[in-house]
A protein has these predicted regions:
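Acidic, metal-coordinating catalytic segment for phosphate/diphosphate chemistry
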Residues: 14-50
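Predominantly extracellular/luminal regions of secreted and cell-surface proteins
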Residues: 1-26, 97
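Active-site segment of metal-dependent pyrophosphate-handling enzymes
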Residues: 98-141
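NUDIX/MutT-family hydrolases
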Residues: 132, 142-173
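Short, well-ordered beta-strand micro-motif
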Residues: 53, 134-136, 155
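Histidine-centered active-site/metal-ligand motif
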Residues: 46, 66, 78, 126-128
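Conserved Nudix-box catalytic region and its N-terminal flanking loop in Nudix hydrolases
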Residues: 59-95, 99
Length: 181
C-alpha cells in the first residue's frame, strides 16, 4: 500500500520536474523492484523521509547541525515499520525539532535525492533514497534533540552561509513552486 502511494508521488514528481529524469528513474526502479525498500534493515539502501520546514513568516528554514554527519541539513530520518513517507517526514520534523505544530504546505514531493551514507560502527555504507516535503511550523520555539548538535532558523537569503550542497540549495528554489501551486 505505502509503496504504491509512494510510486504515485514519484510519478507526479517526475512529470513536474522532467529535468530530473535520471534521479526519478533510479528512485522509481528501486521502489518498484525491491519490496523491502521502506525498511531500514535493507542494507544496500532504503527510503528515507525529510522536510524543508519554513517558519511562520516563510522567510527562514529550520536546519539541523547533524550529529553523525557534522553538516547543516534539513530534518528527517528513517521510516518506522509500515509508515507512509509523508507521515514519517512529519513525525521526524516534530521529534527532531520539538515543535508540535508543524503541518504540510503540500502533500506533493518537494525534492528527491539519492545519496551515499558513509560506513559507521553500526552500518556498512549504503544509499538513502530521500523523499522531501515542504512544511510550515506554527512557532519558532524548537528543542534540540539528541540527533543534532544544534538547530537554527536560517534566513533563506543566507542559506549559503550554512551549506553549499546543491541538494539543500535546490529545495529553496523549489519551495516557491509548491507554495504557489
Amino acid at each position: 500500500m505505502h509503496r504504491r502511494h509512494l510510486l504515485q508521488k514519484l510519478r507526479a514528481y517526475a512529470a513536474q520536474f522532467p529535468l530530473e529524469q535520471e534521479t526519478c528513474s533510479d528512485y522509481i526502479d528501486f521502489v518498484e523492484n525491491d519490496p523491502d525498500c521502506l525498511k531500514r534493515s535493507l542494507q544496500k539502501g532504503h527510503v528515507t523521509a525529510s522536510c524543508w520546514i519554513l517558519c511562520p513568516e516563510r522567510d527562514e528554514v529550520l536546519l539541523t547541525h547533524h550529529r553523525k554527519l557534522g553538516i547543516w541539513i534539513q530534518l528527517g530520518g528513517h521510516l518506522d515499520g509500515g509508515e507512509d513517507v509523508l507521515d514519517a517526514a512529519l513525525r521526524e520534523a516534530r521529534e527532531e525539532s520539538g515543535i508540535p505544530d508543524i503541518r504540510p504546505i503540500s502533500e506533493s514531493l518537494l525534492d528527491l535525492d539519492i545519496h551515499q551514507i558513509p560506513e559507521n560502527r553500526k552500518e556498512a555504507a549504503h544509499l538513502h533514497y530521500d523523499a522531501r516535503f515542504l512544511f510550515q511550523a506554527g512557532s519558532k520555539n524548537f528543542q534540540i534533540s539528541s540527533e543534532s548538535l544544534d538547530l537554527a532558523w536560517v534566513p533563506l537569503d543566507r542559506l549559503e552561509d550554512y551549506s553549499d550542497e546543491d541538494s539543500i540549495l535546490r529545495m529553496r528554489e523549489k519551495q516557491e513552486i509548491l507554495i504557489s501551486g
